[in-house]
Amino acid sequence: MAKLALIEREKKRARLVAKFAAKREALKAIIEDQSKSEEERYEARLELQQLPRNANPTRQRNRCAITGRPRGTFRKFGLARNKIREIAFRGEIPGLTKASW
């Protein structure tokens, strides 16, 4: 199990990303817009730099919903591989069966 502080840090990052998503998209649109003046684009770039680092979605890490494990997490289930295995063997994930050929 991951430390609770790490799990809480990821939750905080998720909240920050959601909070600043609209502002971030608007600033990026201004920066990419070639019809805007160079000064406007420069101001937007400076304003984008002033946003918190953790508001950037690339800083988020997918973690297991049960254990908080950062690696080996399946996006479809939101669980780590070992937890998927345990739950699947108990038959709690509908339609998921062990492969055989």
Curated annotation (Swiss-Prot):
Highest taxon of source: Bacteria
Family: Belongs to the universal ribosomal protein uS14 family.
Recorded GO MF terms: rRNA binding; structural constituent of ribosome
Known function: Binds 16S rRNA, required for the assembly of 30S particles and may also be responsible for determining the conformation of the 16S rRNA at the A site.
Gene Ontology biological-process annotations: translation
Signal peptide: none
Keywords per UniProt: Ribonucleoprotein, Ribosomal protein, RNA-binding, rRNA-binding
Name of the protein this chain belongs to: Small ribosomal subunit protein uS14
Taxonomic source organism: Burkholderia multivorans (strain ATCC 17616 / 249)
Subunit structure: Part of the 30S ribosomal subunit. Contacts proteins S3 and S10.
GO cellular component: a single term: cytoplasm
